[in-house]
Amino acid sequence: HGIVAIKDKEVYRADLERVIDAAQAVAIPADQKILHILPQEYIIDNQEGIKEPLGMSGVRLEAKVHLVTCAVNAAQNIEKCIRRCGLEVEEIILEQLASSYSVLTDDERELGVCLVDIGGGTTDIAIFTEGSIRHTGVIPIAGDQVTNDIAMALRTLSSVGVVIASS
């Protein structure tokens, strides 16, 4: 949550940048870094629910944001791996956010939706309401565990569990 005074009584891009900077001024562990600062809503003089405050008038601007952090070492290792392949990293994006760009519509984000991406090793979750991401999470239970559970229950090979789980 960031709070700043609106300098000229009208919200300009510089005011938005300042309030976002204020919102990210939180203590995070040294082994973590901020990956994304995702604005959820703005508040001008206690008027809540503002999505686009540019040009609006007031004296106090607040921003409610969703901060996404990641392990510094994990990000560095991903970047090193990509560079070893002869490619450059333009940006690291949270998996749930990237998935949401490819499968959700603006209407779904606005109405409210829970995106659940069941991968092999983890299940990634993102909750959207009123057009903004409100929560992200990772559950360490996913497809590989389901496959192994099926194979164990049927006392068969994991490869058979894969076939059953995907049918």
Q: Where are each of the predicted segments found?
A:
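Nucleotide/phosphate-binding catalytic cleft detector across ATP-hydrolyzing
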Residues: 1-115, 132, 157-160, 166-167
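Glycine-rich phosphate-binding loop of actin/hexokinase-like ATP-binding domains
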Residues: 65, 111-153
